[in-house]
Structure formats: C-alpha cells, structure tokens
From Swiss-Prot:
<comment type="function">
    <text>Plays a role in promoting cell proliferation in response to pro-inflammatory stimuli.</text>
</comment>
<comment type="similarity">
    <text>Belongs to the SAAL1 family.</text>
</comment>
<dbReference type="GO" id="GO:1901647">
    <property type="term" value="P:positive regulation of synoviocyte proliferation"/>
</dbReference>
<keyword id="KW-0539">Nucleus</keyword>
<dbReference type="InterPro" id="IPR011989">
    <property type="entry name" value="ARM-like"/>
</dbReference>
<dbReference type="InterPro" id="IPR016024">
    <property type="entry name" value="ARM-type_fold"/>
</dbReference>
<feature type="region of interest" description="Disordered">
    <location>
        <begin position="1"/>
        <end position="39"/>
    </location>
</feature>
<dbReference type="GO" id="GO:0005654">
    <property type="term" value="C:nucleoplasm"/>
</dbReference>
<protein>
    <recommendedName>
        <fullName>Protein saal1</fullName>
    </recommendedName>
</protein>
<feature type="compositionally biased region" description="Acidic residues">
    <location>
        <begin position="30"/>
        <end position="39"/>
    </location>
</feature>
<dbReference type="InterPro" id="IPR052464">
    <property type="entry name" value="Synovial_Prolif_Regulator"/>
</dbReference>
Length: 469
C-alpha cells in the first residue's frame, strides 16, 4: 500500500522517479502484437491484400468447378454473384507486381488453366484469361507463363471462341506476351504451327462488329506481321492458294483486313492505323503484292477505300495545318500503300486525290514556317523527324502522279480550288530538287491551264517547262 501511495505522490508531483516501472509506457496488450504480426504475415508482399482471402477465393473457384464436373457434361458452370465479384477483385489485384508474383508462386496459372478447360461459362473464362493477362504485364511472370506449353495451346484454341469478351482478353494476353522480346519467339513458333490461328483472326475481322475486339485483333495481327515476315508471307500465300484455310469459304487475310478497316472507319478512325500499317506491310513482300494484283477486285477495293479515307476523312481543306501532326501515323502507311498499289495496278488518279497530296505538302510547309517563326525548332525536332517519312512518301507519290498527269485532270484540280498559288509553291518546294522532271511536266501543263501560275513557278524556282513531256 505504501508503495502504491508513493507512486501516486511522485506522479502528482511531476517527478520522474527512479523506479524502472515508471520509466516506460505500459506495454500494449499481447493480443495486439499478435494481431499485427498476423496481419503482416498475411499481407502479399508490400500490399494490403490478404493471402488468406486470395487462397479462399481460389479454393471456392476450384470447388465450384469440381462440383460442376459431377453434373451434366454440357451444362454451363454456374457463377454466383459473390464469387464473380471476388474473382474480378483478383483480376484487378493481378495488376500489382507483388500479387502477380504471388499468384505465380501459388500455381494460380495451373488452376486458371484447369478452370478454362473445364468451364462452359463465358464470363468465367473471360475473367480467368483476364487475370493471366494482367499477370503477363510483368517480365518474370510473363516468362513463366510463356513456358507453359499447355497454356499456350489453350490460348490459341480460344481464338476460335465465339464470345467477344473472351476473345478480347485472349488477344490482349497474346499481344502482351509478343511484346516481351524474351518470349516473343516462343509464341511466334506456336502460332506458326497452328494454321487455325490465321483463319480465326480472319473470321473475327470479317464478321465482328465489336469495336474493342477489332482494335485488339488489328494490333495483334500488326504485331505478328511486324515481328515475323515469314509468317506474313505464309498467311497471305495460303489465303490465296485455295488450300486448307479456304476449304470452308473462310475469308482471306486481305479481304478480312479491309472489312475490319471499313467497320472501324466511322466507329474508331484512330484505330485504322494498325490496319493500314498491316496492309502496307503486305506490299513490302512479293507474296503480298501478288495477292493484291492477282485478285484485282480486292486490290482495287483496297485502293478505293484508302483513297476515300485520304480524300474525305484525313487532312481536309478546312482543317488547321497542325492536323498533320495528329494524323501522321495514319497518313504515312496510307500513302505508302497507295503508292505501291498505283505502280502495280495503274490506277486512276482523281482530282480529289491529287488535291490531297498537294495539301499534305502545303500543311507541312506551313507548320515548318510557324515553327521557325516561333523559334521552336528544339521542341519540334522529334515531330519533324516523325514527319520526314510521311513527307518523303508523299513527294515521291506526287512525283509519279505528276509525270503521268493529263491536262483535263489538272484543269479539274485548279477549278476545284485544290491548286492555288500557295499550295502549288509549297508542293514544288518539297519536290525539288529530287523530282525536277515532275515539276517541269507540271509547269508545262500549267502554261496552258493557268499561265500566271506557271510563270510564278518558273520565276520562283528557275524551272523551265518541258513541252516535249
């Protein structure tokens, strides 16, 4: 009792005292320490996600599929709202690197693969593939997933599925893996060995109206063509050889690309880039050009479609010159494609197309002038480099067109307002000195169609007309 009274007196008197018991704060209850330790042990890596909760969710998934196996073989797996919600949480969690690694260590890919193989529920399949897709966003887990040959086989088979969300997640996962340099060769080899992949992608492009799916399939195909030229040659050759890919009237690769591009034109025009690039890549190999030329109707259809894009959608007269910066990724493959087709199909050049080519060079000149006036060369150096290929392609194509130009077409261009003094000077400045012959032919025609403009070009650029041309 005395000891207790002394302690009270010391505290009341603000004295620290000498007793060890009074030199420290009271210890927390032991159960709080244990709770904190348990929570730390249960956390996945540096996250707040619970290992126990994740184990429980995956266990419920396994149990649900196991129970389903005991029922009719053709029945759909019943996915409860609660389990679907929890699996979607796992899907989101898998975007965290610590969670992705933990799922890999816990053999979650094998569990998900088993569910995909046994499930007849499209939503469940979509979620499982989506989880794997998020896991593949990290290098180490992507490498591990790619080494699973069974998973690779199942994913390629899923390209033949008829559920758009599942197809979307499958394409996303494949594209993610193909973007990893370490594992891309593994996936390319698998795809080369599965001829059904080509027909599956063609079927999607030619029949689907799902914009997100068409965009992702286009990105996947463009990546495949960009990474493996031999695969591209094989697919375009097989599509036009009447062999196994065509036995069931399956669409060929060219018509499928065109059909998907038409679908996206109004829905998602920015997504046309990958389709235009894929078509342009086909013109860089002999097999691709042969397919376009031998099937003249398809080649002409591609020409007509891309001309419409250029003349009606891209880089229009009422657009500001800066539109060239926004649309350069679309314009570059489009013009390269048109240039290749023109030289092989000897297509007709309309006044509208000629006007579009001139306008691109005019907008480029105006952008360059504004950058110079604003002393902003440094800030636009990268953009100028990106535009270089577009301007060169446009100039080369325009040169070829001008060398074949007839007076009636030029007259139509002038009357429609596509060729003013400003646009003509801009175009000629881009064409010289590499394409002098084309400029001479233009000046020669202008001497009859618009003598004043002809004299301006002669004077400004010291160009003489070439009447013999």
């Amino acid at each position: 009792m005395a000891s207790s009274d002394r302690g009270s007196e010391e505290v009341d008197g603000d004295s620290c005292g000498s007793s060890p018991e009074l030199d420290r704060n009271p210890s927390p209850p032991p159960e709080e320490d244990e709770t904190e330790a348990t929570e730390e042990a249960d956390a996945i890596g540096q996250t707040i996600y619970s290992k126990h909760w994740l184990f429980s969710t995956l266990t419920r998934l396994i149990q649900m599929v196991s129970d389903q196996e005991c029922g009719p073989s053709d029945s759909s797996t019943e996915l409860t709202d609660d389990l679907e919600e929890d699996l979607c949480k796992v899907w989101d969690m898998a975007m965290d690197k610590d969670v992705a690694i933990f799922l890999q260590e816990f053999k979650a890919p094998d569990i998900l693969l088993g569910v995909i193989a046994k499930s007849h529920n499209p939503r469940l399949t979509e979620i499982c593939v989506g989880i794997l897709g998020n896991m593949a966003c990290f290098h180490d887990t992507c490498v591990s997933l790619s080494q699973n040959s069974d998973l690779g086989a199942v994913l390629l088979l899923l390209l033949g599925d008829n559920d758009p969300p599942t197809l979307l997640e499958t394409c996303r996962l494949l594209l993610t893996c193909l973007s990893q340099a370490d594992v891309a060769p593994v996936w390319l080899e698998r795809i080369r060995q599965q001829s059904a992949v080509c027909s599956s992608l063609c079927f999607i492009m030619s029949s689907s109206t799902n914009v997100d799916l068409l965009v992702k399939v286009g990105e996947l195909l463009d990546k495949l063509f960009d990474e493996d030229e031999e695969l591209m040659k094989s697919w375009v050759s097989t599509s036009h050889s009447g062999t196994d890919l065509q036995t069931d009237n399956q669409p060929d690769i060219l018509s499928s690309l065109l059909e998907a591009a038409k679908q996206l034109r109004s829905e998602s025009p920015e997504a046309l880039e990958v389709y235009l690039h894929s078509l342009q890549l086909l013109t860089t190999v002999e097999e691709g050009m042969q397919a376009l030329v031998s099937d003249e109707s398809c080649g002409s259809a591609v020409w007509t479609f891309v001309c419409e894009l250029l003349c009606e959608d891209f880089c229009q007269p009422d657009d500001p010159p800066l539109i060239l910066q926004e649309q350069k990724a679309l314009l570059a493959p489009a013009l390269a494609l048109l240039s290749a087709l023109h030289s092989s199909l000897h297509t007709h050049i309309s006044a509208e197309l000629l006007g579009s080519l001139i306008r691109i060079l005019q907008f480029n000149a105006e952008n360059h002038q504004s950058h110079t006036a604003g002393n902003s060369e440094e800030s636009h150096r990268d953009d100028d480099e990106q535009l270089k290929a577009l301007v060169e392609t446009t100039a080369e194509f325009l040169s070829d067109v001008l060398l074949e130009l007839q007076k009636d077409v030029l007259l139509s261009v002038v009357r429609s307002g596509h060729l003013s003094e400003k646009s003509c000077v801009s175009a000629v400045s881009c064409l010289l000195p590499q394409h002098t012959a084309a400029v001479q032919h233009l000046v020669s025609l202008l001497s009859d169609v618009n003598p004043i403009l002809s004299d301006i070009i002669k004077k400004d650029f010291s160009i003489s007309s070439n009447k013999s041309s």
